[in-house]
Amino acid sequence: MKTFLAKKETVQPKWYLIDAAGVPLGRLAVKAANIIRGRHKATYTPTVDTGDYVIVINAAKVALTGKKEEQNEYMFFSGFVGGESRRKVSLMRERHPEFIIEHAVKGMLPKNRIAAKMLTKLRVFGGETHTHEANNPVKVTV
């Protein structure tokens, strides 16, 4: 019996919906990353993008345990001398709540060329509504 290898042409992606309200960030990111990679399918192949699309709503209400809200920082660098800036999670939650989840999921994807394509399958929205109702997403509990 030969090992099954998925082909790019045979993959039929589905859409999944995850509600982030009150869910710990790490658990949410693991679930989303596994769906995006296709790890939940029997046809998973590491070298082919077999993953599905993930819609995350209520990104502003994601839970962080402990004192991470005040202590954790995101570092940005402009490329110029003295161009390093840091922003706390609490500030990012107010301004760009989508960034927190996108950053966590990106860190859980492989560091290769396929990961850039996989990351385009993640759609994060700060509020209750999203623009992908026509795709009939399946609700996933975390």
UniProtKB/Swiss-Prot annotation:
Q: Which GO terms describe its cellular component?
A: cytosolic large ribosomal subunit
Q: Name one GO molecular function term.
A: mRNA binding
GO BP term, pick one:
negative regulation of translation
Q: Enumerate the SUPFAM superfamilies for this protein.
A: Ribosomal protein L13
Q: Does the keyword Heme apply?
A: no
Briefly state the protein's biological role: This protein is one of the early assembly proteins of the 50S ribosomal subunit, although it is not seen to bind rRNA by itself. It is important during the early stages of 50S assembly.
Assembly, per entry: Part of the 50S ribosomal subunit.
Check the record and name the NCBIfam families matching this protein: rplM_bact (TIGR01066)
**Protein family (similarity comment):** Belongs to the universal ribosomal protein uL13 family.
- List the protein's name: Large ribosomal subunit protein uL13
| Species whose genome carries this gene | Opitutus terrae (strain DSM 11246 / JCM 15787 / PB90-1)
